[in-house]
Amino acid sequence: MMCEVMPTISEDGRRGSALGPDEAGGELERLMVTMLTERERLLETLREAQDGLATAQLRLRELGHEKDSLQRQLSIALPQEFAALTKELNLCREQLLEREEEIAELKAERNNTRLLLEHLECLVSRHERSLRMTVVKRQAQSPGGVSSEVEVLKALKSLFEHHKALDEKVRERLRMALERVAVLEEELELSNQEALNLRDQLSRRRSGLEEPGKDGDGQTLANGLGPVGESNRRTAELEEALERQRAEVCQLRERLAVLCRQMSQLEEELGTAHRELGKAEEANSKLQRDLKEALAQREDMEERITTLEKRYLSAQREATSLHDANDKLENELASKESLYRQSEEKSRQLAEWLDDAKQKLQQTLQKAETLPEIEAQLAQRVAALNKAEERHGNFEERLRQLEAQLEEKNQELQRARQREKMNDDHNKRLSETVDKLLSESNERLQLHLKERMGALEEKNSLSEEIANMKKLQDELLLNKEQLLAEMERMQMEIDQLRGRPPSSYSRSLPGSALELRYSQAPTLPSGAPLDPYGAGSGRAGKRGRWSGAKDESSKDWDRSAPAGSIPPPFPGELDGSDEEEAEGMFGAELLSPSGQADVQTLAIMLQEQLEAINKEIKLIQEEKETTEQRAEELESRVSSSGLDSLGRYRSSCSLPPSLTTSTLASPSPPSSGHSTPRLAPPSPAREGTDKTNHVSKEEAGVPRGEGPAVPGDTPPPTPRSARLERMAQALALQAGSPEDGAPPRGSESTPDSLHKAPKRKSIKSSIGRLFGKKEKGRMGPPGRESVSLAGTPSDETLATDPLGLAKLTGPGDKDRRNKRKHELLEEACRQGLPFAAWDGPTVVSWLELWVGMPAWYVAACRANVKSGAIMANLSDTEIQREIGISNPLHRLKLRLAIQEMVSLTSPSAPASSRTPTGNVWMTHEEMESLTAATKPETKEISWEQILAYGDMNHEWVGNDWLPSLGLPQYRSYFMESLVDARMLDHLNKKELRGQLKMVDSFHRVSLHYGIMCLKRLNYDRKDLERRREESQTQIRDVMVWSNERVMGWVSGLGLKEFATNLTESGVHGALLALDETFDYSDLALLLQIPTQNAQARQLLEKEFSNLISLGTDRRLDEDSAKSFSRSPSWRKMFREKDLRGVTPDSAEMLPPNFRSAAAGALGSPGLPLRKLQPEGQTSGSSRADGVSVRTYSC
């Protein structure tokens, strides 16, 4: 910047007036000259910007021409590559948009420059005087340079602010001066008034002194005495007062004179200010006139520029049109040249034939001896000419037929376009409603889009066929003209030969005409344009194509259609034979008279599919409403009914089919795969899942009330007496076990201990004492930090010693209390009491020792629950309100434990946890065979069989199982929610995302396959640990590999630097062994192996295939990488697996009444109730999957 600091501007207005008028005029002229030069320079910059804009536009047009030429070349070279042409068109559009943005930026810069000029001229016209002084001083300081636009703007801005302040100061001083003059005038008037008053008083006093003097003289004369001394004294006083008044009057007069002089000075200053103001106004008016003239000139220039731009644009348009016309003419010229060359070749051939004919004619004239032979030959040639004429007439009729068909195809093309427009409008209207649906509706709309692309391809093929027909027609017309010319020539030759006039043989041709006609035949295209008239394979192929698309659209709900049924979306994906078939398909079918019917069937099929979508939307809405109503009714029924009686179980199993199929729809997403106990009514957030459940019901293909029973939901009732005595024996062993351990450290038992309590030694559950490793004390591991809610102080201690005085008691008291609780449970099991008949202390002991609920929940149950019947009949809201369990996962844990105990202690429970089929629950046939083989006296059951793996509690899940899956980052959330192995199969997507913070979908997939691994092992923890130890050093049994074992395998391949990337990734053996879609590329992506490291990727691919083939039951598809297949999403994959047996296995873990009476509120995703199998059916047919699951307790 040349000047950052503004020069000092004198605030004295009289200094500027000291200059003479000539000097002021010269400075003004110099100022105007500089301003004009600045304006011209800015106009030059504007012109340069406009020139740059014009060059950019010219470049844009050149690029447009280049784009058009490239498009023409592409259309000529690759007319069938629609996908490539579409990509090129998109690129050209993007470039055009970029050029338009550049043009908009240039226009904005031009507008900014125009606004800058207007603002500059406005400032100059308003502040000419200040600008003149500033420019004069700046030129005096730096005479060598001219300031830039930025400096001029800064100077104008500062001058405007300075002179605005100066104007305000001058006005303020003038106002103060006028006020002071007014005050002084008032004071002068007051002083004059006082002087007049003093004069009056003085005159009155003088007259008063004279009168008393006369009176005194008379009295003196009369009396001989007078007050002469007193009068003299008063006169002296009055004279002194008069002198003082005179002095004051003199002072006032002096002040008045001073004020008058000041007033005159102010008037002079005011006059000079008025004169300066008049001069400034004149200069301002002059500058305004100049500005108006400049604006008028600029408007004229702009008008001229706009007219020039319009002329330029019109010239450019004309040039483009001329270029297009030139291109067309060049194309036509090329085609004409090719036709001309062909005609020249034909003329040469005709000349050769004519020479041959002349030679033959000469030979015949020389050799002709008799005229009858020549006449016979002529008669033969006339007959051949007649035949040629007949064939020519047939050919003309064929041409007329082709023209009629061409017109029909044009009309059909118009109708197809109208139908396409109608379909577009209908699809637009439909898209407003289909946007509210879930992913299935979106996929169907994508299918419709593919069908529309097929229709566009057909339209393009139709236009190509029309062009081919036009070319064929032109060639036929040309051949016709050539034939007529040849006929005339041959007739003239015949007339010359016979010596007759040309009119006598107008319908005759020589024998070479037939050769000419057949020699021209090969010039016609011998390919596909004429063949499809008699071919039916094209139509059959097209029917197969559309039928395949229709089948795919009908199978789009379950995604079970093979990948081969999906038609390729673009012609570029077809191979050679497919392209020929597609060409025959579109050309023959659309050019044949029956092609219109196929177009109509396509439109009808689209309309039917759209109507089906609308009907399905209505059905889904009705289903949602009925589901909500029935869920509310069922919730009221569940809250008022018990779950302990066999009759109620059978009545609930005999619900009407409509209720069993509709009211038990799950409010959880399909990714959960099974029911999640929830008693809340369906919320609007889960409407989409209701729709998917409705679709899955339709996929199952089972009518309401007639379908086969789904196994694994509701087990049959069996006796309970045999296993209860064995339960009592197991409890007795547990009560006498020496491994009870020391009691836990006492601490305050509040819900905040979920987050704030330090690690404590937990009370070992009864099952852990029974079936844990005998050589280890089963207290909480000291080195493992966990939220041990089950290990808080007992509820009795809290109830009897709320101040924490129980800490002073020894471990013997705690052992005695635990022994007393075990004795209560042992007594209940020995008596064979169902869970509903348990008393309050037994239920509390069960909650504390077996379920592992926190102490404050146990205390709340002690206060509110007095028997097992109350506990069994508690609804979800009552559990939350009465016991105070606000966490829904804690409520889920309690409900699952209650239902498990109700099923284990009910009279209809199975006599053994292992049945002939290997499952926990049994069919009627198994139950009858078992009751027939079992004596009524056996009333004991081994708790080693039922709860043999009951130590899979929330501590095992958080400390052992989740790290083995590679998901240790979710440990704290699982521990806080008390998630044990019983709850794993009942967690839905909402709970995983919300409370367990498992937002990553891949981590949810990993968790799902970990649960599937546990289910395949029957939740056998010892078996899992044994198999992991056996496969620690060998490549076998990959399904049980932990995340650490997978990392070790990767390190053993020589990829140790990438193995650490699998930490907290969710990669484990069950994912590798059970997920059919997981391949080496996914593993390389998780290992973060760069794509440039081809050697490492090849090694990983080889070893991964060896691992899958040796250690799993999977078989890698060799063509999977080559063939394009569209696999369903993992949600739908889970749903299909649920239908194949995952959900029945998860349902087998629940007791009968849990599915029947509470299923309306708890929900099961897309599965009806399992009905009781009638006698006579085999148990194997009622099983959807052979995987058996053991019941466990945590």
From Swiss-Prot:
**Where are stretches of biased composition, namely Low complexity?**
651-666, 1157-1169
Q: Which residues carry this modification: Phosphoserine?
A: 17, 142, 207, 431, 508, 640, 645, 668, 683, 737, 794, 1123, 1164
Q: Does the keyword Repeat apply?
A: yes
User: Quick one: a GO biological-process term for this protein?
Assistant: synaptic vesicle exocytosis
Q: Which residues form the SAM domain?
A: 838-904, 953-1017, 1041-1110
Q: Chief subcellular site?
A: cytoplasm
List the residue ranges forming a coiled coil, or say none. 26-133, 171-501, 596-644, 1014-1040
Keywords, comma-separated and alphabetical: Coiled coil, Cytoplasm, Cytoplasmic vesicle, Phosphoprotein, Repeat
Q: A Pfam family name for this chain?
A: SAM_2
User: What is known about the tissue distribution of this protein?
Assistant: Detected in sperm (at protein level).
**SMART domains assigned to the protein according to its UniProt record, in alphabetical order:** SAM
Ranges of Basic and acidic residues composition bias in the record: 201-217, 548-559, 624-636, 687-701
Region described as Disordered: spans on this chain:
1-23, 201-233, 522-588, 624-817, 1157-1194
| InterPro entries, sorted | Liprin, Liprin-alpha_SAM_rpt_1, Liprin-alpha_SAM_rpt_2, Liprin-alpha_SAM_rpt_3, SAM, SAM/pointed_sf
Gene Ontology cellular component list: acrosomal vesicle; epididymosome; glutamatergic synapse; presynaptic active zone; presynaptic active zone cytoplasmic component; synapse
Residues where Phosphothreonine is found: 714, 792
- Where does this one sit in the cell? Cytoplasm; Cytoplasmic vesicle, Secretory vesicle, Acrosome
Q: What does this protein do?
A: May regulate the disassembly of focal adhesions. May localize receptor-like tyrosine phosphatases type 2A at specific sites on the plasma membrane, possibly regulating their interaction with the extracellular environment and their association with substrates.
Could you describe the subunit structure of this protein? Forms homodimers and heterodimers with liprins-alpha and liprins-beta. Interacts with the second PTPase domain of PTPRD, PTPRF and PTPRS. Binds RIMS1, RIMS2, RIMS3 and RIMS4.
Q: What is known of its domains?
A: The N-terminal coiled coil regions mediate homodimerization preferentially and heterodimerization type alpha/alpha. The C-terminal, non-coiled coil regions mediate heterodimerization type alpha/beta and interaction with PTPRD, PTPRF and PTPRS.
| Family membership noted in the UniProt record | Belongs to the liprin family. Liprin-alpha subfamily.
| Protein name, per record | Liprin-alpha-3
Native organism: Mus musculus (Mouse)
Task: Give me the gene this protein comes from.
Answer: Ppfia3
